[in-house]
Amino acid sequence: MSGMSRSLFGLGLRKPHYGDFLDGDAPVAVDFVEVISENFMVPGGRPRDVLRRVRERHPVALHGVSMSVGSADGIDRDYLARLRLLADEVDPLFVSDHLCWTRIEGFNAHDLLPLPYTEEALDVVCANIAIAQDVLGRAMLIENPSSYVAFDAPMTEWEFLDAMCARTGCGLLLDVNNIYVSASNHGFDAQAYLAGIPADRVAQIHLAGHSQGRTLLIDTHDRPVPPPVWALYEAAIAKLGPVATMIERDDDIPPLAELIDELQVARDMANAHMRRAA
């Protein structure tokens, strides 16, 4: 990945902000936007027109929620064909999806369900990623999930991700909030997670907020990035160096100016690290 893309700071493009990105001057403080792939995979219509017009002003990353790389019954090739058409049109910075399964025997749960970190699951995931990358004609990024249940398995999540990257050549989308949420829910050390991932495979970072459930933290994307997640982000960029970073907000979405202010915090942290490293 180029040094230029490593220094980018972006936001998720959501419907309440379409006007901000389409009318008047483009927000110069936003280097790129990320969209949910499935919302734009139908040719024609307003969503595709909005994406085309936004793409004229900003680079775009495609982030999926339905590829289901963990499905043991294989990957949906029709889905991949439609995603390939979208990617060819958009020429995205990144194409990404999650380490999870969402579909079985044609039924889609529309949720990011956890995997056991076993050799059998690794075989399934790697085979599906290989097919996806072949159809898409590019390496993709896989995001670490937030999780609320853990299996008795021989590998940690970071060991699984390391092996997955080594076998498939895919990159990582490191969701720092997901690390924090899962570490809290399952009692592992978030710093050990950062130490265990293959640093050279991390191409993008997600930041978001979470909510406190009755007994677990929930990855809700409905509030600002909290201080402990900022602290973990600072630790991540200290290990990784500058990485393209974006902030996710999917509920209780504030005015764009508030998200740009939050994005500036990430930019300032990264710039401070670069000055210290110089």
Curated annotation (Swiss-Prot):
Q: What is the lineage of its organism?
A: Bacteria, Pseudomonadati, Pseudomonadota, Alphaproteobacteria, Sphingomonadales
- In Swiss-Prot or TrEMBL terms, this protein is called UPF0276 protein Swit_4400
User: Cross-referenced SUPFAM superfamilies, in alphabetical order?
Assistant: Xylose isomerase-like (SSF51658)
Q: Which family does it belong to?
A: Belongs to the UPF0276 family.
Recorded superkingdom: Bacteria
NCBIfam families linked to this entry: PRK05409.1
